[in-house]
Structure formats: C-alpha cells, structure tokens
C-alpha cells in the first residue's frame, strides 16, 4: 500500500506539472514536510502493522513453546511414573523369581530325599528277599544232600535182618493205631 502511494508521487513529480517534487535538494520545506509527513503517516501504519504481526507471531511462538513445555513436563511425569511402576514390577518379579526358585529347590530336594528313602527301602526289601531265597536254596540243597546221604547210609546198612525188623515195627505201630479208640 505504501509502495503504491510512493509510486503515485513519483509519477506525479515526473509529470512536470503541478505535483510534489520528491527530490530533496530541489524541494522547499513545505514540500519536504508533506513528503516526510506522508512517509511518516504511511510508514507508521506499515510499521505498526509489521510490529503487530511480529508481536502476534512472537506471542504465538511463546504460547506454543509454553504448551510444548507443559506437554513435555506432563510426558516426563508420566514417564517417571511408568519408570517407577516398571521398577516396582521388576523388583516384584525378581522377588517372586527368588521365592519360586527357593520353593522349587525345596520341592526338588524333598522329592530327591523321598526317592532316596524309597530306593533304600527297595534295596533293603530286595536284599531280604534275596537273603531268604539264598537261605531257602541253601536249606534245600542241604536237605537234599542230607536225604541223599541218609538214603545212601540206610541202603548201605540195609540187609534182610534189619529190613524185617523195620517192617515188624511198622506193623506194630499200625496195629496200635487200629486198637486205639477214636473219640
């Protein structure tokens, strides 16, 4: 707007007719006062418009920065809260992990101790069973050998006279059994 008015004054001054002379050395004080007053008036309006625009821009920038600061502070506060919560959760997980490990260790230890007791009992039972089995086999072998020796000895000593004597004793026992009354 100021530039348009200034161009008009230049055109008028170059027309060589009635107008405003913009050459400072050729003008008189009145013309100079009019030019300076006009420049001051339009310059003041332009400058005040520029200053108002700049003021609005600066205020807007300050408000934006203030908003960003508040937003950043809010984000920082939320981040600190999240960090504290994460630290608490990590501590809780760590303590739960330690507790779980200790419980698991106790459970495994008691399970191993029970397994050891069971194995010892099984070992004792197997040893007893094997001992009884061995004793039975030894007894059976001894009995078999004793019977064979006794039979061999009896067969060696057996003659007709002893044979008759044994038969007679057996017959007496049988007859005594028949004579005994049954109640």
From Swiss-Prot:
Spans through the membrane:
20-42
InterPro entries for the chain: ATP_synth_b/b'su_bac/chlpt
Q: How does it sit in the membrane?
A: Single-pass membrane protein
| Any matching Pfam family | ATP-synt_B
State what this protein does: F(1)F(0) ATP synthase produces ATP from ADP in the presence of a proton or sodium gradient. F-type ATPases consist of two structural domains, F(1) containing the extramembraneous catalytic core and F(0) containing the membrane proton channel, linked together by a central stalk and a peripheral stalk. During catalysis, ATP synthesis in the catalytic domain of F(1) is coupled via a rotary mechanism of the central stalk subunits to proton translocation. Component of the F(0) channel, it forms part of the peripheral stalk, linking F(1) to F(0).
**What family is reported?**
Belongs to the ATPase B chain family.
Q: How does it assemble?
A: F-type ATPases have 2 components, F(1) - the catalytic core - and F(0) - the membrane proton channel. F(1) has five subunits: alpha(3), beta(3), gamma(1), delta(1), epsilon(1). F(0) has four main subunits: a(1), b(1), b'(1) and c(10-14). The alpha and beta chains form an alternating ring which encloses part of the gamma chain. F(1) is attached to F(0) by a central stalk formed by the gamma and epsilon chains, while a peripheral stalk is formed by the delta, b and b' chains.
Give the protein's recorded name: ATP synthase subunit b, chloroplastic
State the gene name recorded for this protein: atpF
